[in-house]
Amino acid sequence: MKVAIVHDWLVNYGGAESVVESILKIYPDADIFTLVYDKRKIGKRFQNNIVVTSSLQKLPFATKLYTKLLKFMPKAFESFDFSNYDLVICSSSSCAKGVITPPDVPHIAYVHTPMRYAWDLFFDYRKRSGRLTRFFMDRWMSGIRAWDYISSQRIDTLIANSKYIARRIEKFWKRDSEVIYPPVHLEKFTPVKNPSLDYYVAFSRLVPYKRIDIAVDACKALGKNLVVIGSGSEEKSLKKRASGAKNITFTGRISDEKLCAYLQNCKALIFCAEEDFGIVPLEAQACGRPVIAYGKGGVCETVKDGVTGVFFPEQTASSAREAIERFEALDKKGAFKSETIARHAASFSEERFIREFKAAAKRAQKMVNQRTVHK
C-alpha cells in the first residue's frame, strides 16, 4: 500500500511533528508532503522518507517566513497529486488538510486545531500584528475562512487530538470527528525516589500565548522558587519582569536529560497556556509530579483536579497564586501520589496512539470501499 502523509510545514520539531513520527511507525515507507522543509532544523528525523515540498519552497527565506504565505497555502496544497496513492493522511493545524484526493483514496485528517488565526482567535492575532499584516488579514481572511470550511468537507475521516478540538471542529466546520489523543513519549519520563521538591517549573517556548508571565508574577509575589525552562521572543521581557527576584531562574534551552531531571524533582509544573492538547503536562505527570494549570483547553482532559494537579479558573497571576496556595494545602495532606499520577500519564502512551490510529484507518478504508462499490 502506497501512503502519503501531508504535514503543514517541517521547519522545527514539536508535538505535531512527533505525531508524524508515530504515524510513520505504522507506515514506515510513506512519502511526506509539506509546504516547506528545513532539513537543518529537523535533522535526521525524516531522512529515510521521500519529502516532497510545494513550489513555495523555492521562495527566498520561505522556511523562515512561511507564516506570511497563508494566502498562497491553499493552492500550494491543492497542487499535490495523489493519484498514485492508496491512502492519504494529513496532520494539520493550518492548510494541509485541504489536499484533493481521488474518490477511491481514503483521506484521513488528524487535526491539531482548525486555524486559530482564521476563526476564534482572529482578533487576538490581529491585535498583536503590525499594520501591514493587519491590512492583509482584513482583506484575505474571509476568503481563507471560506476555503477552510469548504476543504474540510472533502475529508473522509476527521480525527481530533482532544475533545476540546472536536468541539471546535463541530463549531467551525460542522463536522463530527473522533478523538485520538496524541502520542506522548513517556519512556524517558519516570518518577525518581526522594525528589528534592524545592522549586516549581514552567517549561515551554517563551512566546506570548504561553503566558509564562503569569507563573513569573505568581511565584515572585509568593516568594516561591521557579525555574523557567525554554527560549523564545519573550525571554528578555520575562527576565526583566523577574528582575530582583532571586527565587526565579532561567535556564534557556536545555537537553532532554536535564529537562527530565528538572521535572522529576519539581514540586509541580505551572502551566498557564490555553492549549489544544498540551504534551508538557503529561511529561510532568509521567515523572510523578502534579500540574498547576489554567483550567481551559486540552489540559482539562489530561489533568485530574485534586488527583494529578489543580486548576485555576482565570488566566491571571492572582488566580494562579490562589491555585499554588491550594495545591500546597492539598499536598500537605498527601493528596498527590506519585504512583497514581504516573499511572494516569501512562494511558496517553504512543502504543495506545498507534493502536487507535490503526483502527481508525481501517474504518476509513472500509467506508471508502463501500462508497466505491455503491457507485
Feature names for model-found ranges:
Residues 236-257:
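Nucleotide-activated donor-binding/catalytic signature segment of Leloir-type glycosyltransferases, i.e.
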Residues 270, 290-295, 303:
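Short hydrophobic beta-strand element within catalytic cores of glycosyltransferases
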Residues 315, 332-369:
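A charged, aromatic-enriched C-terminal amphipathic alpha-helix characteristic of glycosyltransferases
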